[in-house]
């Protein structure tokens, strides 16, 4: 089983989407992006709620682009869950099975199996309005899985829950998800949630997929400036490319002269570099490939287990001959034996140049 979205286009007034992506059997793809980027539209097109104007949607080798929603056997968990208040838990889970004319005895067996999967055994006769928020989420997921769907789509299913419950349900979702081979598209605007639930992440903006990669790659090795800034797992800085050397490109940046050792494409008109969080150290590292710089602390906040530090870098002349005063922010693990950097003071930082890469 797999999902392939090929050249799919849809226009709503001034907004249009143009989508190309795929999801493999048993894989969860997190579709991540800012509000209004086209995430929910993508789900509507796959599920059949909306029809594409161009392109093809292929599920398990079959082109389903022209099939009505009820013939696609694709389950959707909506943000508002869309549970039927007049039906009990079992009735909600069995609703799709009833529509498909599955015999009653088989429906009851599937309902009990689905409830066991989401740890709600014995809840079949419970009313929806007696359930907690987390229990309702589990019922919605059980209903989605009961029909053995060809694909599973979730539209920000945990966004209305408080933080501790969201964290708990993310872990449970991973366990539940491991029992199904159906390809899954999980829409969220939460970067942490995407990193936890997904195998790969597709970043969408303006109705277009900007970048698709594994969770580790998109956080630590983004290829685009938009992805680097959106996921915020490092620092994005302007630079001037000075020359190409044997070990890489030498660049001038607000951090000083650096060497970009990892080969990657860059925008020759507006080159940018990305340094992941693990590429910085606040301990004195006199090792090959590491470069030291000094910056002024403009803000330092102790937050219990961590420190939030904002640094003002020395003035730097950009490629457009403009003087740039960049600020960068870090979160550091708080060490009670180390002195907390004070605002107005200076601190030394070391950079692992082997982790620097261009973003376009």
Functional labels for PLM-detected ranges:
Residues 47:
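Helix-to-loop junction immediately C-terminal to a conserved catalytic motif
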Residues 3-13, 17, 57, 298-300:
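Conserved beta1/A-loop at the N-terminus of ABC ATPase nucleotide-binding domains
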Residues 73-75, 79, 86-226:
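ABC ATPase nucleotide-binding domains
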Residues 32-34:
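The feature captures the beta-strand-to-loop junction immediately N-terminal to the Walker
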Residues 40-43, 139:
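ABC ATPase nucleotide-binding domain helices that frame the ATP-binding cleft
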Residues 55-63:
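Conserved ABC transporter NBD signature motif
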Residues 13, 234, 244-360:
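Non-catalytic connector elements of ABC transporters
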């Amino acid at each position: 089983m797999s999902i392939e979205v090929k050249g799919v286009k849809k226009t709503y007034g001034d907004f249009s989407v143009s989508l190309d992506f795929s999801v493999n059997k048993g894989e969860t793809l997190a579709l991540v992006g800012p509000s209004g980027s086209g995430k929910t539209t993508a789900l509507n097109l796959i599920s059949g709620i909306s029809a594409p104007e161009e392109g093809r949607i292929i599920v398990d080798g079959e082109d389903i682009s022209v099939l009505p929603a009820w013939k696609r056997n694709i389950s959707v968990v909506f943000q508002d869950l869309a549970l039927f208040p007049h039906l009990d838990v079992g009735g909600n889970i069995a609703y799709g099975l009833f529509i498909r004319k599955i015999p009653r005895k088989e429906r009851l067996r599937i309902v009990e199996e689905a409830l066991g999967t989401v740890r709600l055994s014995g809840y079949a006769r419970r009313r929806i309005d007696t359930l907690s928020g987390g229990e309702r989420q589990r019922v919605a997921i059980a209903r989605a899985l009961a029909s053995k769907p060809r694909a599973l789509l979730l539209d920000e299913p945990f966004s209305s829950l408080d933080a501790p419950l969201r964290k708990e349900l993310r872990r449970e979702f991973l366990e539940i998800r491991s029992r199904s081979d159906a390809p899954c598209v999980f829409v969220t605007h939460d970067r942490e949630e995407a990193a936890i639930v997904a195998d790969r992440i597709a970043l969408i903006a303006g109705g277009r997929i900007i970048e698709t990669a594994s969770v580790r790659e998109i956080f630590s090795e983004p290829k685009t400036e938009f992805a680097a800034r959106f996921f915020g797992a490092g620092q994005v800085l302007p630079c001037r490319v000075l020359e190409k050397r044997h070990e890489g490109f030498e660049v001038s940046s607000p951090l000083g002269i650096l060497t970009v050792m990892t080969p990657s494409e860059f925008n020759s008109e507006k080159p940018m570099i990305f340094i992941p969080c693990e590429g910085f150290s606040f301990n004195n590292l006199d090792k090959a490939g590491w470069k030291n710089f000094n910056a002024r602390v403009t803000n330092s906040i102790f937050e219990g287990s961590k420190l939030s530090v904002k640094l003002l870098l020395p003035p730097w002349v950009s490629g457009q001959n403009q003087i740039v005063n960049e600020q960068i922010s870090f979160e550091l693990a708080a060490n009670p034996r180390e002195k907390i950097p004070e605002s107005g003071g200076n601190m030394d930082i070391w950079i692992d140049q082997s982790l620097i890469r261009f973003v376009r």
